[in-house]
Amino acid sequence: MKKIILFFIIINLFACKKERKISETFSFIKTEIKLPINKNGNTIKTRFNLLDGFTRITTKPNTFQNYLQHFKLKPVDSKVHLYNGALKYNQSIHAGILAISVGNRDLQQCADATMRLRAEFLFTQKRYNDIHFNFTNGFRVDYSKWRKGFRLKVKGNKVSWYKTDKESTSYKSFTQYMQWIFMYAGTLSLNKEMKSIPISKMQIGDVFIQGGSPGHAIIVVNMAKNTQNKTVFMLAQSYMPAQDIHILKNLNNTSISPWYNAKNLTVLQSPEWEFSNKDLKRFN
């Protein structure tokens, strides 16, 4: 797509592109973390064993939470690849890799991965009217309109729809719609679309997100509790360049990795970004 306007380039160049000191600290640490892994498990729910005394959060069928818990993973010891087939420079921070394509363009980065997972779930549920995202200029892009054969036209900072002859309801067409979202949406726009959630109300599918230049987003993909009502959770991300969506290790508390402790959480230090407890948000 050569017709990428300067406004979007400036915003998206910095959407997920600058590592903070936390990533400089952990990037090349050779971590020897004994992960609680069931090598025969092929989903997020079955791959990672529970910590002692904890019970996995039960999710209802046909919900986003259940969809993420049962998301298939690539085989144990798989490596994180970039969109161009190259290996990610740092292979020491992931505990597992989601079995979903990254595409062959440098598009599916941080916020894009969370939007992809959300949209894929809604697509499988045939909830097409619920699939919509805003571009960074505020223009709302509804997948339901795309399915009817409408396409997007970008001129300067203006976006408009135009009608083609045919409806396009295939999965391939859906992925083409998502590429437009990846190009013109990001942490800045997604952050404005989501609603803030306190840590005490965290659910699977919630997102830690910082919108801006730079910005980043990681998604909660599993949770568990014990009898003392202590909660732990698991996180997944993509990064830049566009790369496989992967489960993050907990480098700050290797004894519970890849789980993270929600109790008294004020600062969340993930391997490549630092978040605040105020950064937790939920899809509407």
Language-model segments: which ranges?
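Low-complexity, Gly/Ser/Thr/Pro-rich intrinsically disordered linker/tail segments
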Residues: 231-284
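Cationic-aromatic interfacial patches
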Residues: 17-101, 108
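Short beta-strand-centered aromatic/proline hotspots
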Residues: 216-225
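Positively charged n-region of N-terminal signal peptides that target proteins for export
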Residues: 1-4
